[in-house]
């Protein structure tokens, strides 16, 4: 699992004074989703985590300080905090995974399974993000080979698949 906090924004509210929202990017098993959290939510998580695992220090909250430089330092500190929790703990607590909106799948014995893969899918937030492993610049079956030399292996395989009743030349 990889966690980053690429940005933050100031949110104004009619009911209370404004606050800062941190955008958390979570990458897990080739999937990426975003979660937005306030500093108070990070602080509440930290208090709960301290009871069950060893936690790094959380950046301090400067009371009502919306100076961009201070907020950027806090963003970096919170990102480092999340990454340190992941690095220092082999098994992450459920409340940490819930904070990041990650579905917790307990490890099962090899004889058990979850049924269909679709049941373990999370909703919209888990879109695949991957890169192609193999890329053809031209269709190898439609366009002829650029070289004049015949590809004996491919011809043999195609001959064996499509014309098994004929003897090779």
UniProtKB/Swiss-Prot annotation:
Family note: Belongs to the sorting nexin family.
A GO molecular-function descriptor: phosphatidylinositol phosphate binding
Domain of life, source organism: Eukaryota
Native organism: Bos taurus
Signal peptide: none
Cellular compartments annotated: Cytoplasmic vesicle membrane
Modification Phosphoserine occurs at: 113, 116
Residues found modified as N-acetylmethionine: 1
Residues annotated for a 1,2-diacyl-sn-glycero-3-phospho-(1D-myo-inositol-3-phosphate) binding in this entry: 38, 40, 61, 74
Lineage, opening ranks: Eukaryota, Metazoa, Chordata, Craniata, Vertebrata
Alphabetical list of InterPro entries matching this protein: PX_dom (IPR001683), PX_dom_sf (IPR036871), Sorting_nexin_PX-domain (IPR052467)
Gene Ontology CC annotation, any one: cytoplasmic vesicle membrane
Any Pfam family hit: PX
PX domain boundaries: 1-125
Record keywords, A-Z: Acetylation, Cytoplasmic vesicle, Lipid-binding, Membrane, Phosphoprotein, Protein transport, Transport
Membrane-topology annotation of the record: Peripheral membrane protein
Protein name: Sorting nexin-24
GO term, biological process aspect, one: protein transport
Domain remarks in the Swiss-Prot or TrEMBL record: The PX domain mediates specific binding to membranes enriched in phosphatidylinositol 3-phosphate (PtdIns(P3)).
Task performed by this protein: May be involved in several stages of intracellular trafficking.
């Amino acid at each position: 699992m990889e966690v980053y906090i690429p940005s933050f924004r100031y949110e104004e509210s009619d009911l209370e004074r404004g606050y800062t929202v941190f955008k958390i990017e979570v990458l897990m098993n080739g999937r990426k989703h975003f979660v937005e959290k306030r500093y108070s939510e990070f602080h509440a998580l930290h208090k709960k985590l301290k009871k069950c695992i060893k936690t790094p220090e959380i950046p301090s909250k400067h009371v009502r300080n919306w100076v961009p430089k201070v907020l950027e330092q806090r963003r970096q500190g919170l990102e480092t905090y999340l990454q340190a929790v992941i690095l220092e703990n082999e098994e992450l607590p459920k409340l940490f995974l819930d904070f990041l909106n990650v579905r917790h799948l307990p490890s099962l014995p090899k004889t058990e399974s979850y049924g269909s893969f679709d049941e373990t899918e999370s909703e919209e937030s888990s879109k695949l993000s991957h890169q192609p492993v193999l890329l053809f610049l031209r269709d190898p079956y439609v366009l002829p080979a650029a070289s004049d030399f015949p590809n004996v292996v491919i011809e043999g395989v195609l001959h064996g698949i499509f014309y098994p009743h004929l003897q090779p030349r």
